[in-house]
């Protein structure tokens, strides 16, 4: 009893220290104030874990979620401030970077309540899980603001190392070990290729590492059309391609999705793409400014392959998580259209808007997979047959998120794709947009196939998993339903109010 009281006093004292540091940073300012909040949250988690017992576990969720919400609040207060380059040019703060940081923080904030019941049922180590999630979030935020080659390399490595550890969190699962090994090997190879490309940029620009200085250096050395820049472009595209996972750099994606814990997959499926998209826009648009035709062609090829292969292979999948893996490959093909269009025709604004909708659609679907998987122990698509008869809320929520992913009106996914394709059409990407429209129709087929299974009412089609389905008595079930409700609302309502969201996204010039 005395020990528990001492723990509570220690927690309160630690919280006071945290709030005092928060107050100092708030009123004295900081270039990386949102990142500092997460760092304080990480330190606080470690301090409490070293002195607490199992009864204090709710504090871990509270501290993690509070750190993320406070970091989002700090970003919102800093909105529309003048762009600042800090840390000797290594880090840049502007609206464009901050909106991507906001998306990453939003992903993490929704993923933590989605993970609570899974962690309790599987008895995963809660502290390490939250530490890896917050550290990966921190790495993604630094990547969004990176302004030189070294930071662009180090920040994703911070994110990637946490991703490897999270994907292999269930060490006794053979599929998880296989997925982690493949993820680690391909991640290491892609990082090596990325560094190789950066070395060509560094040498060709006369030893510059800041993005804008690289452009100036290429002009001074007259190397902007040299073969070295072509090698740098190809190597950089391959390195970034692994993070974005478009075809043909998608080989790790289905295995990691299937073998990793479902909350981890939900986290990685959105944060990695947001961070990599932010980095890709800056790298391609600034250092490779003089090679715009070449990288446009490369990205068009990746987008076409991703949209075709991702959606066609998704039709044949029997595992829900593998289906979403190939679906995500197709989705990143749509996002690449926005990167190619760029800022001239609202390409970045449409990309950011669609990614916001994709976060809600994807996390809402994964919340359903977590909830259903914990009660049935299966991931097979056919085992979802008749779920509506047992859990109408779960089935209807899943149907709305899947319909939004398919791009059916009047849901958010439809308006997001519509604006993305319209921007591509205005930019003259007629073939690319046509492929996007055709593959979107294909994707509707396999989403509707799942919805048909969910809503079936015939007893002969209802699987034993659904017949024995029982809703969880755990209080933490409310956290999954909370995440799912937020995602469903975000997947439907924003479609009616696109203009304010687009206006905010259009104000992200860098």
UniProtKB/Swiss-Prot annotation:
Its EC number is 7.1.1.-. One of its GO terms (biological process) is photosynthesis, light reaction. Keywords: Chloroplast, Membrane, NAD, NADP, Plastid, Plastoquinone, Quinone, Thylakoid, Translocase, Transmembrane, Transmembrane helix, Transport. Pfam families: Ndh2_N, Proton_antipo_M. The keyword Transcription regulation does not apply. It is a multi-pass membrane protein. It is found in: Plastid, Chloroplast thylakoid membrane. It is an enzyme of class 7 (translocase). It catalyses: a plastoquinone + NADH + (n+1) H(+)(in) = a plastoquinol + NAD(+) + n H(+)(out); a plastoquinone + NADPH + (n+1) H(+)(in) = a plastoquinol + NADP(+) + n H(+)(out). GO terms for cellular component: chloroplast thylakoid membrane. GO terms for molecular function: NADH dehydrogenase (ubiquinone) activity; quinone binding. The chain crosses the membrane at residues 24-44, 59-79, 99-119, 124-144, 149-169, 183-203, 295-315, 323-343, 347-367, 395-415, 418-438. Belongs to the complex I subunit 2 family. NDH is composed of at least 16 different subunits, 5 of which are encoded in the nucleus. PANTHER family: NADH DEHYDROGENASE. This is NAD(P)H-quinone oxidoreductase subunit 2, chloroplastic. It comes from Maianthemum racemosum. The gene is ndhB.
């Amino acid at each position: 009893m005395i020990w528990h009281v001492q723990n509570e006093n220690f927690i309160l004292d630690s919280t006071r220290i945290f709030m005092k540091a928060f107050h100092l940073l708030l009123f004295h300012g900081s270039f990386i104030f949102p990142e500092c909040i997460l760092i304080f949250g990480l330190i606080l988690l470690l301090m409490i874990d070293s002195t607490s017992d199992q009864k204090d576990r709710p504090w871990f969720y509270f501290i993690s979620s509070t750190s993320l919400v406070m970091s989002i609040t700090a970003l919102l207060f800093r909105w529309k401030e003048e762009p600042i380059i800090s840390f000797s040019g290594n880090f840049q703060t502007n609206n464009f970077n901050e909106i991507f940081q906001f998306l990453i923080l939003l992903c993490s904030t929704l993923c933590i309540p989605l993970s609570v019941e899974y962690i309790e049922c599987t008895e995963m180590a809660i502290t390490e899980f939250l530490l890896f999630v917050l550290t990966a979030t921190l790495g993604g935020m630094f990547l969004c603001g990176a302004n030189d080659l070294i930071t662009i390399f180090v920040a994703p490595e911070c994110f990637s190392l946490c991703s490897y550890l999270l994907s292999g969190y269930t060490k006794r699962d053979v599929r998880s070990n296989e997925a982690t090994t493949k993820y680690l090997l391909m991640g290491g190879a892609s990082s090596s290729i990325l560094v190789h490309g950066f070395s060509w940029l560094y040498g060709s620009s006369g030893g510059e590492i800041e993005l804008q200085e690289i452009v100036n250096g290429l002009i001074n050395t007259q190397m902007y059309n040299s073969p070295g820049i072509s090698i740098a472009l190809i190597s950089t595209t391959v390195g970034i391609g692994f993070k974005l996972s478009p075809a043909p750099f998608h080989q790790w994606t289905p295995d990691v999705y299937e073998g990793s814990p479902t909350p981890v997959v939900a986290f990685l499926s959105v944060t990695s793409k947001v961070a990599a998209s932010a980095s890709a826009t800056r790298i391609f648009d600034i250092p490779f400014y003089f090679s715009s035709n070449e990288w446009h062609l490369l990205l068009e090829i990746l987008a076409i392959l991703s949209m075709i292969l991702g959606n066609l292979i998704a039709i044949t999948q029997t595992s829900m998580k593998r289906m979403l893996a190939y679906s995500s490959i197709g989705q990143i093909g749509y996002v690449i259209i926005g990167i190619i269009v760029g800022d001239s025709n609202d390409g970045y604004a449409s990309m950011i808007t669609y990614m916001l909708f994709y976060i809600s659609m994807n996390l809402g679907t994964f919340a359903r997979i977590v909830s259903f998987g914990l009660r049935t122990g299966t991931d097979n698509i056919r085992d979802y047959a008749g779920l509506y008869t047992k859990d109408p809320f779960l089935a209807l929520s899943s149907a709305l998120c899947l319909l939004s992913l398919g791009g059916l009106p009047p849901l958010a996914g439809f308006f997001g794709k519509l604006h993305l394709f319209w921007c591509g059409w205005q930019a003259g990407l007629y073939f690319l947009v046509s492929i996007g429209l055709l593959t979107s129709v294909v994707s509707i087929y396999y989403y509707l196939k799942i919805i048909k299974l969910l809503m079936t009412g015939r007893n002969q089609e209802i699987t034993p998993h659904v017949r024995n389905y029982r809703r969880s008595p755990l209080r933490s079930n409310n956290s999954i339903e909370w995440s799912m409700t937020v995602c469903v609302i975000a997947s439907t309502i924003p479609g009616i109010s696109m203009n304010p969201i687009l206006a905010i996204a259009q104000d992200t010039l860098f």
